[in-house]
Amino acid sequence: MTSTRKLSVSCLIVFMVSSLIAVSSGWLSSTGKSPLKIGKCDPKNGNLYAIGRKWYNDEDCFEITCIQGDKGSVAQQVASCPVHAVKPGCELVFPGGTYPKCCPYYECPNS
């Protein structure tokens, strides 16, 4: 494994471990509340989403849901991939696609 690849894997592991603190089987979080825009979420991607509507961020492998906040606001609830412990001898695969199909997984030689 090249030193660049080792550094990339090390950075990924640090990110994954820090994400593990959130929730071990994937995580949900509410992100910044937005002002009410006709009862819809405005994620600044050019689209408005009704409360209960889901959309996807394929680049970061997230599922985002527009939820009702408090005091006349809406919020974006984000679902992300579970975090895996490091498996020596295995390769971490990033399959791409839309959540949850884009979630990384380990491919081990003897499994």
UniProtKB/Swiss-Prot annotation:
SMART domains xref list: SVWC
Annotated signal peptide: 1-26
Taxonomic source organism: Ethmostigmus rubripes (Giant centipede)
Assigned keywords, A-Z: Disulfide bond, Secreted, Signal, Toxin
Domain of life: Eukaryota
Record Pfam families: SVWC (PF15430)
Sequence similarity: Belongs to the scoloptoxin-16 family.
Tissue: Expressed by the venom gland.
Cellular component per GO, a single term: extracellular region
Cellular compartment(s): Secreted
Modifications made to the protein after synthesis: Contains 4 disulfide bonds.
Name recorded for this polypeptide: U-scoloptoxin(16)-Er8a
Gene Ontology MF, one: toxin activity
InterPro entries referenced in this protein's UniProt entry, alphabetically: SVWC_dom
